[in-house]
UniProtKB/Swiss-Prot annotation:
The keyword Phosphoprotein does not apply. Residues 13-168, 159-292 form the N-acetyltransferase domain. This is Mycothiol acetyltransferase. Acetyl-CoA 1 binds at residues 77-79. Catalyzes the transfer of acetyl from acetyl-CoA to desacetylmycothiol (Cys-GlcN-Ins) to form mycothiol. Belongs to the acetyltransferase family. MshD subfamily. It comes from the Bacteria. It catalyses: 1D-myo-inositol 2-(L-cysteinylamino)-2-deoxy-alpha-D-glucopyranoside + acetyl-CoA = mycothiol + CoA + H(+). Keywords: Acyltransferase, Repeat, Transferase. Acetyl-CoA 2 binds at residues 230-232, 237-243. GO terms for molecular function: mycothiol synthase activity; protein-N-terminal-alanine acetyltransferase activity. GO terms for biological process: mycothiol biosynthetic process.
């Protein structure tokens, strides 16, 4: 039987046994590649049918060895390390309905497959990190003149008002971004359901009762934390407030035990990359979108 004939379409979120196999596959892939094959949203899609993700799977002897997860725009895939170079990745890419394929970590194997299929790199997302002395130095924070700070948990306005202002600030900051821009109240509410989410980890700079910017923190563990999203409202750009906004989050994370902080940034966002490098961040990983 050809590999393409082994591909089945399913929704893993509706099959508990298959979901457990998928999570095991992802664990085995990470152990070899050193990077997660699926992003957080697609991992959630393995358990939450409401996200509407569809899946293509390849099994051998009743064992899941290949998986492609797809939403309306992109696909992410994982192939078991012991079953690579057998045409599974190619078959999954050929069968997926989207043209955009994420290669997390952009491993040598992913690059070789993309080259074989003559796929073109159209987007690159960098993972940057900071730790130890550099983190301590960059975690120094002081409110700019006329500016105060809070978290969502102790905002100076009603929580619903703060959330509406946060949403507006986000959409102003990311009107160009394919995933982070154009958020709705429903999309924000869904994001707040993540098991790691805390109101106290959503930080704001305030000019009176107006949000200057926000810094959303994700705590993977006390030692490893993340600048999940950071953005300035349009009215406050170009006023030197981006640096204290980042430092506010770093100060918060360091105070909660962080020894390493990571972030994701578009490689093409040269000013942001340069600003993070100035703070002491270095590039740790590269994630790439290939178009077929």
């Amino acid at each position: 039987m050809n590999t393409s004939d082994r591909i089945k379409s399913t929704q893993i979120a509706l099959d508990r046994d298959l979901r457990e196999q998928a999570l095991l596959l992802l664990k085995e892939v990470r152990a070899v590649d050193g990077v997660d094959a699926l992003s957080e949203q697609f991992v959630r899609g393995l358990a939450e049918p409401g996200l509407g993700h569809s899946h293509l799977i390849v099994t051998l002897n009743d064992k899941l060895v290949g998986l492609a997860a797809t939403d309306e725009e992109t696909t992410e895939l994982a192939v078991h390390p012991a079953h690579r170079r057998q045409g599974i990745g190619k078959a999954l890419i050929d069968a997926t309905p989207t043209s955009s394929i994420w290669a997390h970590g952009n491993t040598a194997g992913a690059q070789a497959l993309a080259s074989t299929l003559r796929m073109k790199k159209t987007r690159e997302l960098l993972v940057m990190e900071i730790s130890d002395r550099a983190l301590d130095d960059s975690a120094a924070y002081k409110d700019p003149d006329g500016i105060t700070h809070s978290s969502l948990a102790n905002a100076p306005v009603e929580k619903s008002v703060a959330e509406a202002k946060w949403l507006q600030s986000n959409n102003e900051a990311f009107d160009w971004h394919p995933e982070q821009g154009g958020w709705t109240t429903h999309r924000l509410a869904q994001a707040q359901k993540a098991d790691w989410y805390k109101d106290s980890d959503v930080l704001f700079l305030w000019d009176g009762e107006e949000i200057v910017g926000f810094h959303w923190v994700k705590q993977h563990s006390p030692e490893l934390q993340e600048i999940y999203v950071v953005g300035l409202s349009s009215a406050y750009r170009g006023r030197g407030l981006g640096d204290p906004l980042v430092r506010l989050g770093l100060h918060h994370m360091r105070a909660h035990g962080a020894r390493k902080v990571i972030l994701y940034v578009e490689a093409g966002n040269t000013p942001a990359v340069a600003a993070y490098e100035k703070l002491g961040f270095t590039v740790a990983e590269s994630h790439v979108v290939y178009e077929k």
